[in-house]
């Protein structure tokens, strides 16, 4: 059995869970998320906890039990507290600003990069060189952060580019004669 999958998920106040037709729906103050649950996993929702059990004793069912539990725990955390990812812009003239639902980036190209935010994800720019991406879906927040970083990843000689706030860029030495 999966050690991760055995642990029950405690529902915080303000969160509701509904399991019907193979779909697990979690509602909270920050929105609603839905996840299809694999047929090899059984779900029990009672007195403020969610537990998962494999439908049979196969290795696949045990693996899926842990996966479904982890995805559901992220959904519960997302609709109650939310997720955020911080990015920093390093480089002369690199700037970011929010225009409606889009993020406008000036990254040293001959044109501005406009990145449209998907539904459920918001961007903030406390300063011109900081971006905070927030949302209730952990996968979407991480995907948007990776896409924004992908426009100009940190280069290894000067470290210029878009980087995660907790990322350490290892700089190479230049070629010596």
Curated annotation (Swiss-Prot):
A biological process (GO) annotation for this entry?
cytoplasmic translation
Under the heading InterPro entries, the entry gives: Ribosomal_uL6-like, Ribosomal_uL6-like_a/b-dom_sf, Ribosomal_uL6_a/b-dom, Ribosomal_uL6_bac-type, Ribosomal_uL6_CS
**A GO term, aspect molecular function:** structural constituent of ribosome
For this protein, the record's PROSITE patterns field holds: RIBOSOMAL_L6_1
The SS bond pairs are none
- The entry's keywords: Ribonucleoprotein, Ribosomal protein, RNA-binding, rRNA-binding
Please provide one cellular component term from the Gene Ontology annotations of this protein.
cytosolic large ribosomal subunit
The keyword Ribosomal protein appears for this protein:
yes
Q: Where is the signal peptide?
A: none
What Gene3D superfamilies does the record tag this protein with?
Ribosomal protein L6, alpha-beta domain (3.90.930.12)
Subunit structure and binding partners = Part of the 50S ribosomal subunit.
Q: Which HAMAP family match?
A: Ribosomal_uL6_B
- Say what the protein does: This protein binds to the 23S rRNA, and is important in its secondary structure. It is located near the subunit interface in the base of the L7/L12 stalk, and near the tRNA binding site of the peptidyltransferase center.
Which family, according to UniProt? Belongs to the universal ribosomal protein uL6 family.
Query: Mind telling me what this protein is named?
Result: Large ribosomal subunit protein uL6
Species of origin reads Ralstonia pickettii (strain 12J)
């Amino acid at each position: 059995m999966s050690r991760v999958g055995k642990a029950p998920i405690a529902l915080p106040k303000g969160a509701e869970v509904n399991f019907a037709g193979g779909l697990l729906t979690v509602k909270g103050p920050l929105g609603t998320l839905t996840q299809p649950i694999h047929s090899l996993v059984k779900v029990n929702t009672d007195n403020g906890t969610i537990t998962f059990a494999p439908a049979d004793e196969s290795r696949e069912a045990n693996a899926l039990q842990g996966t479904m539990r982890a995805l559901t725990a992220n959904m519960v955390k997302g609709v109650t507290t939310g997720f955020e990812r911080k990015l920093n812009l390093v480089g002369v003239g690199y700037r970011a600003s929010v225009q409606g639902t889009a993020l406008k980036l000036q990254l040293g190209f001959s044109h501005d990069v406009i990145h449209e935010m998907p539904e459920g994800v918001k961007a903030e720019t406390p300063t011109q060189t900081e971006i905070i991406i927030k949302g209730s879906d952990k996968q979407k927040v991480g995907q948007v952060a990776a896409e924004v970083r992908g426009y100009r990843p940190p280069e290894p000689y000067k470290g210029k580019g878009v980087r995660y706030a907790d990322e350490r860029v290892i700089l190479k030495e230049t070629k010596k004669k």
